[in-house]
Curated annotation (Swiss-Prot):
Main location: mitochondrion
The protein's name: Mitochondrial glutathione transporter SLC25A39
Protein family (similarity comment): Belongs to the mitochondrial carrier (TC 2.A.29) family.
Keywords, sorted A to Z: 2Fe-2S, Heme biosynthesis, Iron, Iron-sulfur, Membrane, Metal-binding, Mitochondrion, Mitochondrion inner membrane, Repeat, Transmembrane, Transmembrane helix, Transport
Length: 359
């Protein structure tokens, strides 16, 4: 097979192996991803950032029918895009029926409250979008990584030590650019539990307001999170895998070694890049605010300004919001993904050898 890589399998077989790993990983890890997104998206109401509360009330109250403008009447504004807005003309809580949106105090609290108030199925919200995004993206990413690493090492463009870092960064940069719109859709589904119709309205409004570039909202922080993550992950993975392989007999399977090396490398990379994950989540969750309130945002902060604002508002803890679910997700998901991928590659290697030996 002339198109096989040095590992003995073709790019198509690499894509099948990595795609299967993406499906298995998504099924196991989506609940943790949902909890992470919910924890990270907890912040002051988007409405309060767009304009002062007094102006927001005056604009909303002026549009009410006269029958609802009498003293003491309250309005619960909810269009499925933003969190409900509780509006009262005298500034008091004059209605006991209104309950504040659910707040989460931690990972286990989020799990319990999501299941109790929204049902178990909510933990897998956004799974279809996740699969549509992750299967082709992961297949392209892992295949590109292996091909780039072989190319760099084969032509001595970089040392074998740093080839995984360079190949991982380049492969992830291309993948992030292609899947950024689907990442935005998945984040909205998980964070605000929108129906697909509401999500479509939200996306169309954003495109009408900011053009097609709005679909790449969050590309900057996503790239800042994923490209360094990929570089760190593959660099550490190859080092840990090489070290562990030297401790075990060569005739033993490498899948277990890949599982351990992938988990350790994923945990380290996830910790170092978590602040950019928080920025990416908060920026993407804000999609739809303009459509819901019919107002223009005061400004669009850069990634670094958002980092400083989060640090000023919530301290270091805010930059590492969702730390536990991200680490709990990153370690096993990286371990499952890479070990499944290695298992698939081993399977195709054996299959190819048998085909070569068969008459």
């Amino acid at each position: 097979m002339a198109d096989q890589d040095p590992g003995g399998i073709s790019p198509l077989q690499q894509m099948v192996a990595s795609g299967a790993g993406a499906v298995v990983t998504s099924l196991f890890m989506t609940p943790l991803d949902v909890v992470k997104v919910r924890l990270q998206s907890q912040r002051p109401s988007v409405a309060s950032e767009l304009m002062p509360p007094s102006r927001l009330w005056s604009l909303s109250y002026a549009k009410l029918p006269s029958s609802l403008r009498s003293t003491g009447k309250c309005l619960l504004y909810c269009n499925g895009v933003l969190e409900p807005l509780y509006l009262c003309p005298n500034g008091a809580r004059c209605a006991t029926w209104f309950q504040d949106p659910t707040r989460f105090t931690g990972t286990m609290d989020a799990f319990v409250k999501i299941v109790r108030h929204e049902g178990t199925r909510t933990l897998w919200s956004g799974l279809p979008a996740t699969l549509v995004m992750t299967v082709p993206a992961t297949a392209a990413y892992f295949t590109a990584y292996d091909q780039l690493k072989a190319f760099l090492c084969g032509r001595a463009l970089t040392s074998d030590l740093y080839a995984p870092m360079v190949a991982g960064a380049l492969a992830r940069l291309g993948t992030v650019t292609v899947i950024s719109p689907l990442e935005l859709v998945r984040t909205k589904l998980q964070a605000q539990h929108l129906s697909y119709r509401e999500l479509g309205t939200c996306v169309r409004a954003a495109v009408a307001q900011g053009g097609w570039r709005s679909l790449w909202l969050g590309w900057g922080p996503t790239a800042l999170r994923d490209v360094p993550f990929s570089a760190l992950y593959w660099f550490n993975y190859e080092l840990v895998k090489s070290w562990l392989s030297g401790l075990r007999p060569k005739d033993q399977t490498s899948v277990g070694i890949s599982f351990v090396a992938g988990g350790i490398s994923g945990m380290v990379a996830a910790t170092l890049t978590l602040p950019f994950d928080v920025v990416k989540t908060q920026r993407q969750v804000a999609l739809g605010a303009v459509e819901a309130l019919r107002v223009m945002p005061l400004n669009t902060d850069s990634t670094w300004l958002l980092l400083r604002r989060i640090l000023a508002e919530s301290g270091t803890r805010g930059l590492f919001a969702g730390f536990l679910p991200r680490i709990i997700k990153a370690a096993p998901s990286c371990a499952i993904m890479i070990s499944t991928y290695e298992f698939g590659k081993n399977f195709f290697q054996r299959l190819n050898r048998e085909q070569l030996l068969s008459p």
